[in-house]
Amino acid sequence: MGGTDAKDILGLPKTPLSLTQEKKSRPQKESHRKPDGISREVYALTGGVAPLMPSIDLKRRPPADEKVAWKWLSFTNSARKDDLQLYHWVRVVNDVPPTGDYSFAKYNKSVDILKYTDEEYENHLTDSVWTKEETDQLFEFCQNFDLRFVVIADRFPVSRTVEELKDRYYSVNRALLRARAQSPADVANHPLMKEPYDITRDRERKRALSMVLSQSRHQEKKDAEILAEAKRITEMRLAARRAEEPDVSANENAGLDKADGVVPGRSVSPTSNSQLPATAVAPSTLTMADYASTLASLRMLHVYLRTYGLEQMVQAASSAVGLRTIKRVEQTLQDLGVNLKPKVPTKTVCDEHLELRKEILTLLNLQKQLQYKESEGSSHREGSYAAMPDTPKDRVFAPDPFSFGAERPIKKEQKRKGPGRQADTPSPAHKRPRKLKASDL
């Protein structure tokens, strides 16, 4: 009897009221029918896929305490002298309009032009080519057009070149500074006094610039070929000059040979020379040539990063050595507490860094040569005692009991049998008896 039948007999409801209400309160899940043509296993994998991006609940912005509004307000610009009143939109916070000067008034910059009096002009500024009216008009245009001499030359009533206008303006300023100063030392460091305007140099500069801008493609190609040929000749001369200079490592190697007892007039055994590495016997001419070529190519660039130049010089200096030697140089730098790349790569620091790398490389070459010398000396010592037999000091003399002082009899050499032949031959006890013949009877 099930639970439902017992409830029917007792007259109890099949489902409690609380459970019925709970079922009513729960939302019913939407049932999705499996599409046709898709298996049940595949369709089960499609449900419950995790979202590609995590859902982020955006927090509600708290209500702002400030009340912001945009209003159409009037303003005046301090750069203008006529007190013109204009209008623009302004951001107003809590109904309090902004105060202060116009925000774009700070960009109104003007050039400070020197002013002179009639007395100063008569005493210091008179010129046979320029009149006072022309000079006054020039300074007025310089004030209005902010020293834009191209615009001034276009507006000037008298036909004057840009160079002539510049020369007159700067000469008047220098004369006024010199006349108003109490001593020449007071204005000696002024830019107009230290670097005066040179009209001849300016004309020559513009003439050269116009020639460069007006040349044809054929002339540009020809100039490029000339520059490339000059670069090649410079590199060849520097490489030849570097190759002719004596190497520091070669001089130190020669001094070490003298200290070891090698006389310059005598010849050294070929075995010792063959054992020494090439970097310790002869100077690295190829490395110096690469170093000079790299230096010449960097100079032709005119503008380059100091770290890039240092890397190129280090690669050129390490081109003739192996990777193991380069790692030993870097390890030595780290042991000395020196960075592989300088933190402040000035010219002096880079030169000292390259010099330190050269000295470390020379030290490693000398250590390698010393190691070869020591191995050569040890081999000579071992070879001198190899021909002499060792004295049997610890061996006890035991006479032969069979010889009694005479020579041991030499055993007769037995004939060797092949392997496995003796084992295959049966013993005499196991031999089968020979059959008797008629002649034996």
From Swiss-Prot:
One annotated GO molecular function: DNA binding
Cell compartments where the protein resides: Nucleus
BP terms from Gene Ontology: chromatin remodeling; DNA repair; negative regulation of DNA-templated transcription
Ranges of compositional bias, category Polar residues: 268-277
Keywords: Activator, Chromatin regulator, Nucleus, Transcription, Transcription regulation
Segments forming domain SANT: 126-175
Compositional bias (Basic residues): 429-441
InterPro entries associated with the record: DAMP1_SANT-like, DMAP1, Homeodomain-like_sf, SANT/Myb, Swc4/Dmap1
First-listed, main subcellular location of the protein, grouped into a coarse class: nucleus
Location of the region described as Disordered in the Swiss-Prot/TrEMBL record: 1-38, 244-277, 373-441
Skewed-composition ranges (Basic and acidic residues): 21-38, 373-383
GO CC terms, sorted: NuA4 histone acetyltransferase complex; nucleus; Swr1 complex
The protein's role, per its UniProt record: Component of the SWR1 complex which mediates the ATP-dependent exchange of histone H2A for the H2A variant HZT1 leading to transcriptional regulation of selected genes by chromatin remodeling. Component of the NuA4 histone acetyltransferase complex which is involved in transcriptional activation of selected genes principally by acetylation of nucleosomal histone H4 and H2A.
Assembly description: Component of the SWR1 chromatin-remodeling complex and of the NuA4 histone acetyltransferase complex. Interacts with EAF1A, EAF1B, TAF14 and TAF14B.
Family: Belongs to the SWC4 family.
Protein known as: SWR1-complex protein 4
Lineage: Eukaryota, Viridiplantae, Streptophyta, Embryophyta, Tracheophyta
